[in-house]
């Protein structure tokens, strides 16, 4: 039990007017450490007890069992708790050293599945920085879900169907060169895609041709299908190379095309339940009772189905296949209305498990304040960006540690980690402006800064030849150590908060805070000095490294032992 929960529990024993959870949320950290480690404001009880807050605080301080604390004292309207730092630090360090990387592992999920719809790039288009957010947020959430005891199922719902394939087939047949596409598939396909979109603005007949080719593709035309399959295969080879670089893997690549034969069932179910209404020749589901003004367009007047029809089929398939406890869609905020409709239609169909579905939305990545667009050719491609980040990391490592043995592997871990961490430290609903120089910096709130703190600790432990003894109790009570102990003790709650809010930035900010606290400790403490406290200090370093490495792992970022 962490100290905040312990204090809330002790207060709850003598304050029946408040739930323990409410007490927990009221606890404050005093600005001055001389006033204790945590404080309970008695104002919240003044109305119920009809007493002055100062009198309530004084009464509570006398009635609370103080045996587990150094001291409990009333100061004005607050009950201040002074923690037994030596005892708590011993408990925390013993726990972390014993558990290692399993420290803070939780069993809330009990092995139940969480489906994660993530990454989902469009076939025949380059993997850009715009796709990065869904990929790294989804990957981090998968690690966090597993830490909470769930079994994540990472689904790459590929954009491998739609009118754009009609456009691409027309472009390839008009201007494409097979040898050029085979040599540089994504580059060539992007050029064709940008060109046909530009020319279609002045030549409407190209749109008609594209629609015709997509109709042929839907009907199984051999030439159209072979071209589509080729575009898909070449794109996947490219994507998988990039996923390998990012250290991201998937459990399923079932994309839009996978559900082509599963949508008729959705239409039949909607028809059987009497939910489909005709509107101007199209089929819709009215959702006004859910506060959604616009009906969900299920089938257009020309008989074509829409994204929502496909997503309904996907939701049904995933529930039947994985029996998920939760299903999350890591998709940009611009799709918020779509996912509200999706959940509402499923609810209307009688599927209460739609309440377990969450749209994990996020803001846009911009460059110089401008929105990125593949169609207009305004795009930051991921592959050269990753290469540049690794190169910059290598240059910094060369300057700091030219004798480092495994420079290439470390540069890769730092460069890739820098890009991922910068994205993940941003509250996901906020966008950010892409700045590679800021990302790869070893100073400030960056991935390399946190990684360097971990590598610094490993260097200290190597110099000391220190490995903690599991049967030894280590404890510290100085202010700098205590700041680190409190953070380490808080790690399980940080994981739970990140899980509850689907928010990796909570984990990234924790990692920054822990790295900063350790660097402050390093600057003020002679860790390797040969005195009776040396092993206690080294045990703190050892535990800090475990938690830093695990926090980075939950973000999908490596923690090199040397930098």
From Swiss-Prot:
The keyword DNA-binding does not apply. A motif ('HIGH' region) lies at residues 121-131. Keywords: Aminoacyl-tRNA synthetase, ATP-binding, Cytoplasm, Ligase, Nucleotide-binding, Protein biosynthesis. It comes from the Bacteria. It catalyses: tRNA(Arg) + L-arginine + ATP = L-arginyl-tRNA(Arg) + AMP + diphosphate. One of its GO terms (biological process) is arginyl-tRNA aminoacylation. Monomer. This is Arginine--tRNA ligase. The lineage of its organism: Bacteria, Bacillati, Bacillota, Bacilli, Lactobacillales. The gene is argS.
């Amino acid at each position: 039990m962490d100290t905040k929960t312990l204090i809330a529990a002790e207060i709850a024993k003598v304050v029946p007017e408040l739930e323990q959870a409410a007490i927990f949320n009221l606890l404050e950290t005093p600005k001055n450490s001389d006033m204790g480690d945590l404080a309970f404001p008695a104002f919240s009880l003044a109305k119920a007890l009809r007493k002055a807050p100062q009198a309530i605080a004084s009464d509570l301080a006398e009635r609370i069992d103080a045996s587990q604390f150094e001291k409990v004292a009333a100061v004005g309207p607050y009950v201040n708790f002074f923690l037994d730092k030596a005892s708590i630090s011993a408990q925390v360090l013993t726990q972390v050293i014993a558990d290692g990387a399993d420290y803070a592992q939780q069993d809330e999920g009990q092995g139940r599945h969480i489906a994660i719809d993530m990454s989902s790039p469009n076939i025949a288009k380059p993997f850009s920085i715009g796709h990065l957010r869904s990929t790294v947020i989804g990957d981090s959430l998968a690690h966090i879900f597993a830490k909470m005891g769930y079994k994540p199922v990472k689904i790459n719902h590929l954009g491998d169907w739609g009118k754009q394939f009609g456009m691409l087939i027309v472009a390839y047949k008009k201007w494409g060169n097979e040898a050029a596409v085979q040599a540089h598939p994504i580059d060539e396909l992007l050029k064709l895609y940008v060109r046909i979109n530009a020319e279609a603005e002045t030549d409407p007949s190209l749109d008609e041709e594209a629609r015709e080719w997509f109709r042929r593709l839907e009907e199984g035309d051999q030439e159209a299908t072979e071209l589509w399959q080729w575009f898909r295969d070449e794109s996947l080879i490219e994507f998988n190379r990039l996923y390998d670089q990012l250290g991201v893997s998937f459990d399923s690549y079932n994309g839009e095309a996978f559900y082509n034969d599963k949508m008729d069932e959705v239409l039949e179910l909607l028809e059987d339940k009497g939910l489909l209404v005709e509107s101007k020749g199209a089929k819709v589901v009215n959702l006004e009772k859910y506060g959604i003004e616009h009906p969900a367009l299920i089938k257009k007047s020309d008989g074509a189905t829409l994204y929502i029809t496909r997503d309904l089929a996907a939701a049904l398939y995933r529930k039947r296949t994985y029996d998920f406890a939760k299903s999350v869609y890591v998709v940009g905020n611009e799709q918020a209305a779509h996912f509200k409709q999706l959940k509402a239609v499923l609810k209307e169909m009688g599927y209460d498990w739609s309440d377990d579905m969450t749209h994990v939305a996020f803001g846009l990545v911009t460059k110089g304040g401008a929105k990125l667009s593949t169609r207009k050719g305004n795009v930051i491609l991921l592959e050269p960006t990753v290469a540049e980040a690794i190169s910059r990391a290598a240059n910094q490592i060369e300057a700091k540690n030219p004798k480092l043995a495994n420079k290439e592997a470390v540069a890769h871990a730092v460069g890739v980690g820098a890009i991922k961490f910068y994205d993940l430290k941003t509250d996901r609903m906020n966008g950010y402006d892409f700045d590679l120089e800021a990302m790869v910096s070893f100073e400030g709130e960056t991935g390399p800064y946190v990684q360097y703190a971990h590598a610094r600790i490993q260097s200290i432990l190597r110099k000391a030849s220190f490995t903690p003894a599991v049967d030894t109790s280590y404890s510290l009570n100085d202010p700098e150590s205590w700041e680190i102990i409190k953070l380490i003790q808080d790690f399980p709650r940080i994981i739970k908060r990140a899980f509850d809010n689907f928010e990796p930035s909570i984990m990234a900010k924790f990692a920054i805070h822990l790295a900063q606290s350790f660097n402050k400790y390093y600057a003020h403490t002679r860790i390797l000095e040969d005195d009776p406290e040396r092993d206690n200090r080294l045990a703190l370093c050892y535990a800090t490294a475990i938690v830093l490495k695990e926090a980075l792992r939950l973000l999908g970022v490596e923690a090199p032992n040397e930098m």
